[in-house]
Amino acid sequence: MKRDSDMKKTGSTSDFLPTRNRELLQTLRRLIMTTEGVPLGGLYAMAAQSPCSRFWVSEKRAAEVISRMMRGEDTDVKSLPLRNKMYRELLRRVQEWQAQNPGRPLTDAVFAAVNSPAPEFYVTPESAKVIISRIMQRKRR
């Protein structure tokens, strides 16, 4: 049985896996069609670092982490470099949104930030390869 500390947080990326995974696969396919001379491993890295339609985390989870960051509290994402990078970018966008919309609730700022285009998928090239390989295996069955 999993301990609470081993389980994913409610509202984490896992709520969006099918949509994120489809978008990642589409990105890889586009790169395959438009990029010459790059080995497949390089294409996985390029796909992982490509812009995507949104940040793949729920507004609820993002609000929890960003709120703690704004209060200077320790977050549980510091040991995960890409997660940390993603939340730092979300925090930057939230603060920018709040400066332009004073008096509005944090939840509005987080909603706007999470649902804005993200600069990358925030997954490692190795994770991108595993994600896409699993999708392709399911399609073959």
Task: Report the location of each language-model feature.
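Short, leucine/isoleucine-rich alpha-helical interaction segments at C-terminal helix-coil junctions
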Residues: 135-139
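Basic, amphipathic alpha-helix used for nucleic-acid engagement in HTH/winged-helix/SANT-Myb modules
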Residues: 1-33, 45, 50-99, 140-141
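Secondary-structure junction/capping motif
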Residues: 39, 58, 74-77, 81, ...
